[in-house]
Amino acid sequence: MTLSQALNKAKKGLSQKGFRGGLESEILLGFVLQKERVFLHTHAYLELNHEEEACFFELVKKRLNDCPIEYLLGSCDFYGRSFFVNEHVLIPRPETEILVKKALDVISQYHLKEIGEIGVGSACVSVSLALENPKLSIHASDISLKALEVASKNIERFCLKERVFLKKTHLWDRMPTIQMLVSNPPYIASGYPLEKSVLKEPHKALFGGVKGDEILKEIILLAARLKIPFLACEMGYDQLKSLKECLEFCGYDAEFYKDLSGFDRGFVGVLKSFLR
């Protein structure tokens, strides 16, 4: 089977499923052959060997079963860098890059040196923050050992073992004193309908409880109890009112921000007592 024939066959199946058949078939075949997409067109009549053909259509089959393409490739781009991902971590989203930018603004303005992240996942947030600010040390936690293994690989990939430290724990149990807490926690309500491909991601990283904001409220209460001066979190589009009340109750002045689609997506909080 030629490259052209393989692409056309895969494109047809993927398009019928509602995926971007042309693009995704090229990405997957390029991944198998370790070639750029343009190569597939300039060498359209090259023959695939048996192993290449079998590997390609196995990936297509998994994609047709709603496996996210990032898991098939084992990578995802975030904040201009490529991160290792697998089925044990949430796939980094473009809107979370806004959280990184908001956190960096605070870190720069107040010259912060020690911060923390709850729910580190792939470590894309902690790694991005550390690379953008070379003087920063980050302590990051996750409840999932499998997620921490992924995070560790990304920290090693970017040579950050001396500045990003991992620990398996619930929220911030037995963790160091920090100046700022950053988190993109699970915030989807348990009954909320999601696409099949999203449901392939770890449910512990998606669902935040019956209403969805329960873990976020835990984090806010925790930050207030530990008197952490700054708090930056991603949240659900419909959680502004409840979280604003929680932040005010806990003594935080908060500024909320929107995502690229115009939905409420997160906040940066400053402890009022810190500003006095």
Descriptions of predicted regions:
Residues 272-276:
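Flexible, glycine-/basic-rich loop-and-beta segments that form/coincide
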Residues 140, 208, 232:
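Conserved SAM-binding loop
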Residues 70, 188, 238:
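Active-site beta-alpha loop architecture of Rossmann-like, nucleotide-cofactor-dependent enzymes
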Residues 187-215:
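Mobile active-site "lid"/loop adjacent to the S-adenosyl-L-methionine
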Residues 97-191, 218-221:
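Conserved SAM/SAH cofactor-binding pocket of Class I
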Residues 211-269:
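Conserved Class I SAM-dependent methyltransferase catalytic core
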Residues 31-105:
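Conserved AdoMet
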Residues 1-33, 41, 45:
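Non-catalytic accessory regions of SAM-dependent methyltransferases
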